[in-house]
């Protein structure tokens, strides 16, 4: 491209193309460096400040732009903020720079150039999309073209609108018909732009019995038109869909065109399926859109072109009305909106344009054919063979549910059962969509909620493939990832009802119905002081659930646990995640209940012990104070004087009554240390009993993870394996009971020889009576001599 720039005679154009290429390359290189860096910190250039007195060069300015673009990224890896644009993208970006440069030409040159650009682009688009004798309006906002078309229809049907204004509309109100499957907010946008009240909008329902549930009901539309005419209203405009915003279904445009011609209604068509008009084979429903009065298209996403305007093609013979409606303009700068698309179309050519749309349609067909072979995947566009949009969802019939159930409640199913099954599948589909978007980001998959079907996954390569560079291998990887996630989805869905029944049958546990959770279920432990009538959070419950989460994570099972909800004002719950294998729900619930109960008991014991210790410390302080006062009375005041006290203690030592004090945590009292010295002298060690371990978990084989169902009843086990399994269990039981037997044997061996020795008995009796032992007297007398 650098060599071709040298051939340009105008040095300004050559310099512009060179600068644009260098700027884009600099931003892309800096983006790659930013992605390679870990933990990028905010630099001083990102902080707003005053305008510098001296100017900066272009490299410094672009560096500042790059810092502003990537300085606030999170630490977690995210999708690139700048799409990987190729040469055709550079041409589209160059169009905006050229537009600013061309606007500086003199008026005559500017008029000729803009007229040529607008006429060329209009002619090319009309021929590509089979729209004969049409005009084009280029606009940045996708809905702006429809608003201009509505103004044109109003001026065409109300001849006195220019003079009388809205008084004409008041006498005969216009009606704009929108499909129930239209994109959200379209009707409100039109009313705001046109200044019409909301009663001027008429929402046409979709089919309910025959045909797609996302297609406009033509018979009902005709009935609405007749009713409006009888009420003195004027049917003005009908917005049809060639590919609805949700699932990509196409209305029966041929029937709608006949109906509009019969009642004099303007027919406007929009939708992603209009791109297939450029292909050699087009379905009859989409081909009928070429005969409509106007249609809006978005070639930018279809071709992967950044900053390319949307296009509205229309047919009208009165230039004055189109000028009043705003579809045409006398300003040359307004005509320059087509410049980026004009450059890009010339760069791609007709073959490149058609090839991109064809590639996107082939990706959709490839995914649709592959998903038909996958179990538990329901495709919502099977009747739309030519649709470039594929919408699917995971769906598995639960035991006891009606196999006819799809989205409409079946009479023999209770509403609660239908809703529970629907919410369960919706949560699982949301989880599946998030997983697929992370595993296959090039697929451009989106998650959406439909009113009838529920949560679904949409694959629309026409809107994403050119930008993300989606290939056939990405579609195959997407199908493989779906198949790998199906066992987890099926296992989780089957365990939900069993988990709920086990929780409801367990005392102290409450099942929480959270439709947005995709895991096995949500459970809450109700402690003794829990206020069941209130949903506000309590600190005790939060501590119990936090300890429960820690204990469960220490088990190293395949399940994931978390504490919720995210709203801090609500009571905390335990969320059990997805199940990748056959989980024993009974053991899981029993473990949760037993662990939570143990944590609560330990917390109660700790609270009681704290209170006992606090009271014991207070009593001990009082006793120590009394002992200090008694010692003062017994020894006298003179012994407390340093010099005098030493002399008195030298000649008349004080006989100590106690060797020390110890604080008993269990009783919360201050005791003497004499028993400890007695036991030390005898050498009698105390054997503590083994700590009892909880028996809430069943015995498992070595290497078997918690919460797994046992395979004792499996026919695949041979006699040898079963015998070895029994021997392993016996060894485990023998090892677990070993310390207790050893302790019992040791205690019996020490206790059988007979009663305690006489010396030990005498010492104990002497201690209990408070009479000092002769040996103690001897040691007390020799104390001062040794000091001397």
UniProtKB/Swiss-Prot annotation:
Gene Ontology biological-process annotations: carboxylic acid metabolic process
Region entry Disordered, spans: 28-51, 684-788
Amino acid composition bias (Polar residues), ranges on this chain: 738-750
Keywords: Decarboxylase, Lyase, Phosphoprotein, Pyridoxal phosphate
Residue ranges with Basic and acidic residues bias: 28-40, 725-734, 772-788
GO CC terms in record: Golgi apparatus; intracellular membrane-bounded organelle
InterPro entries linked: GrpII_AminoAcid_Decarb, PDXDC1-like_2nd, PDXDC1-like_3rd, PyrdxlP-dep_de-COase, PyrdxlP-dep_Trfase, PyrdxlP-dep_Trfase_major
Cofactor needs: pyridoxal 5'-phosphate
Modified residues (Phosphothreonine): 414, 687, 691
EC code(s) of this entry: 4.1.1.-
Entry GO MF terms: cadherin binding; carboxy-lyase activity; pyridoxal phosphate binding
PANTHER family: PTHR42735, PYRIDOXAL-DEPENDENT DECARBOXYLASE DOMAIN-CONTAINING PROTEIN 1-RELATED
Family that this chain belongs to: Belongs to the group II decarboxylase family.
Protein name listed in UniProt: Pyridoxal-dependent decarboxylase domain-containing protein 1
Gene: PDXDC1
């Amino acid at each position: 491209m650098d060599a071709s720039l040298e051939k340009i005679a105008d040095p300004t154009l050559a310099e512009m193309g060179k600068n644009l290429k260098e700027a884009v390359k600099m931003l892309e290189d800096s983006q790659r460096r930013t992605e390679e860096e870990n933990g990028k910190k905010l630099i001083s250039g990102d902080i707003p400040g005053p305008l510098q007195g001296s100017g900066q060069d272009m490299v410094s300015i672009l560096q500042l732009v790059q810092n502003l673009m990537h300085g606030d990224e999170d630490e977690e890896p995210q999708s690139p903020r700048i799409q990987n644009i190729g040469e055709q993208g550079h041409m589209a970006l160059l169009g905006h720079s050229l537009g600013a440069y061309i606007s500086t030409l003199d008026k005559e040159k500017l008029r000729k150039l803009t007229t040529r650009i607008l006429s060329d682009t209009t002619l090319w688009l009309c021929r590509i999309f089979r729209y004969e004798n049409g005009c084009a309006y280029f606009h940045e906002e996708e809905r702006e073209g429809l608003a201009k078309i509505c103004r044109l229809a109003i001026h065409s049907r109300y001849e006195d609108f220019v003079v009388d204004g809205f008084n004409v509309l008041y006498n005969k109100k216009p009606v704009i018909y929108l499909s129930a499957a239209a994109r959200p907010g379209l009707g409100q946008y039109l009313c705001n732009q046109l200044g019409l009240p909301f009663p001027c909008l008429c929402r046409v329902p979709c089919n309910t019995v025959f045909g797609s549930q996302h297609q406009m009901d033509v018979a009902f539309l005709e009935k609405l038109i007749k009713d409006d005419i009888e009420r003195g209203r004027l049917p003005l405009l009908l917005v049809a869909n060639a590919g609805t915003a949700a699932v990509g279904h196409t209305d029966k445009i041929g029937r709608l065109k006949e109906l509009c011609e019969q009642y004099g209604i303007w027919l406007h068509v929009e939708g992603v399926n209009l791109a297939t008009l450029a292909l050699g084979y087009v379905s009859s429903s989409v081909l009928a859109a070429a005969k409509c009065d106007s249609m809006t298209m978005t070639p930018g996403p279809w071709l992967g072109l950044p900053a390319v305007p949307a296009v509205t093609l229309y047919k009208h013979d009165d230039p004055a009305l189109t000028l009043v409606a705003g579809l045409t303009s006398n300003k040359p700068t307004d005509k320059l909106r087509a410049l980026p698309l004009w450059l890009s179309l010339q760069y791609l050519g007709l073959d490149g344009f058609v090839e991109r749309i064809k590639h996107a349609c082939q990706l959709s067909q490839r995914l649709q054919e592959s998903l038909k072979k996958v179990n538990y995947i329901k495709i919502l566009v099977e009747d739309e063979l030519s649709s470039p949009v594929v919408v699917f969802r995971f769906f598995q019939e639960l035991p006891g549910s009606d196999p006819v159930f799809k989205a409409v409640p079946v009479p023999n199913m209770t509403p609660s059962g239908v809703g529970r099954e629907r919410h369960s599948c919706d949560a699982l589909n949301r989880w599946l969509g998030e997983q697929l978007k992370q595993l296959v980001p090039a697929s451009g998959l989106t998650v959406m909620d439909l009113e009838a079907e529920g949560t679904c996954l949409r694959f629309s390569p026409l809107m994403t493939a050119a930008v993300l560079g989606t290939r056939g291998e990405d579609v195959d990887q997407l199908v493989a990832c779906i198949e790998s996630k199906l066992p987890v989805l099926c296992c989780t869905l089957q365990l939900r009802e069993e988990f709920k029944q086990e929780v409801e049958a367990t005392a102290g546990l409450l099942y929480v119905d959270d439709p947005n959770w995709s895991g096995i279920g949500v459970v809450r432990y109700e402690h003794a002081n829990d206020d069941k009538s209130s949903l506000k959070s309590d600190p005790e419950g939060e501590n119990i659930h936090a300890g429960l989460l820690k204990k469960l994570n220490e088990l190293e099972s395949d399940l994931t646990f978390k504490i919720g909800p995210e709203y801090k004002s609500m009571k905390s719950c335990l969320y059990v995640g997805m199940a990748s294998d056959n989980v024993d729900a009974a053991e899981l619930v029993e473990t949760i209940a037993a662990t939570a109960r143990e944590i609560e008991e330990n917390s109660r014991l700790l609270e009681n012990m704290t209170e006992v210790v606090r009271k014991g410390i207070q009593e001990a302080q009082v006793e120590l104070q009394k002992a200090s006062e008694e010692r003062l009375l017994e020894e006298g005041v003179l012994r407390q004087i340093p010099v005098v006290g030493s002399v008195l203690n030298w000649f008349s030592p004080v006989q100590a009554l106690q060797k020390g004090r110890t604080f008993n945590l269990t009783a919360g009292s201050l005791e003497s240390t004499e028993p400890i010295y007695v036991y030390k002298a005898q050498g009698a060690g105390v054997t503590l009993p083994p700590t009892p371990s909880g028996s809430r978990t069943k015995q498992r084989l070595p290497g078997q993870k918690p919460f797994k169902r046992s395979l004792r009843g499996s026919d695949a086990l041979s006699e040898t394996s079963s015998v070895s399994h029994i021997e392993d269990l016996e060894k485990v039981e023998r090892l677990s009971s070993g310390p207790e037997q050893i302790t019992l044997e040791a205690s019996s061996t020490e206790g059988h020889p007979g009663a305690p020795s006489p010396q030990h008995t005498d010492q104990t009796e002497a201690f209990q009576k408070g009479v000092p032992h002769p040996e103690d007297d001897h040691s007390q007398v020799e104390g001062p001599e040794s000091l001397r």
